[in-house]
């Protein structure tokens, strides 16, 4: 009975360690993707605000209302 429990433990622990390492790696990859998405959104916001700001200056310059 003891040898059966010992063999089950020898199979169980490496499996759980391997699983936790895979989950850590997956979490790290997701964090990298999230950072890349956040950077792209920040760039898009910067471009959009720059375009809108330039548009306002053009409208003010052409209409003379500002």
UniProtKB/Swiss-Prot annotation:
Residues 1-22 form the signal peptide. The keyword Secreted applies. Disulfide bonds join 60-66. Expressed by the skin glands. Residues 23-45 form a propeptide. One of its GO terms (cellular component) is extracellular region. This is Nigrocin-2GRa. It comes from Odorrana grahami (Yunnanfu frog). The lineage of its organism: Eukaryota, Metazoa, Chordata, Craniata, Vertebrata.
